[in-house]
């Protein structure tokens, strides 16, 4: 009988929770802004973890600058993570910007524009029929 979740999925979920707590409470860097961890992918041997993040950038901050600031803290975050979780080997962490939220908003805006354009065309064609 197979397990509902594989060990790598359970470790990824735990890493996501712990990393969120570490970033929220222990990493103090004004360059980061508000960081959200959207997903964590762990390799099968649990040696590497890809952490996908999004940022709420304020002022002159860009996602690229926030990601660069976060990458400066990778070693320190890994050390804190090692103290919080019990694994034989703490995964090497790599942060990646997750643009799915931005792409989703862009797609939503495109759909809204098309719907509004269609409504406008229907109104215009309805007026032409009346004349």
Curated annotation (Swiss-Prot):
Q: Organism, per UniProt? A: Vibrio parahaemolyticus serotype O3:K6 (strain RIMD 2210633)
Provide the GO MF annotations for this entry. ribosomal small subunit binding
Q: Which keywords are on file for this protein?
A: Cytoplasm, Ribosome biogenesis
Cross-referenced HAMAP family: RbfA (MF_00003)
Name where it mostly resides.
Answer: cytoplasm
Homology family: Belongs to the RbfA family.
InterPro entries in alphabetical order: KH_dom-like_a/b, RbfA, RbfA_dom_sf, Ribosome-bd_factorA_CS
Function of the molecule: One of several proteins that assist in the late maturation steps of the functional core of the 30S ribosomal subunit. Associates with free 30S ribosomal subunits (but not with 30S subunits that are part of 70S ribosomes or polysomes). Required for efficient processing of 16S rRNA. May interact with the 5'-terminal helix region of 16S rRNA.
Q: How does it assemble?
A: Monomer. Binds 30S ribosomal subunits, but not 50S ribosomal subunits or 70S ribosomes.
Top-rank taxon of the source lineage equals Bacteria
SUPFAM superfamilies the record matches? Ribosome-binding factor A, RbfA
State the compartments where it is located: Cytoplasm
Q: Name it.
A: Ribosome-binding factor A
The record, for Gene3D superfamilies, names: 3.30.300.20
Q: For this chain's UniProt record, which GO biological process terms are given?
A: maturation of SSU-rRNA
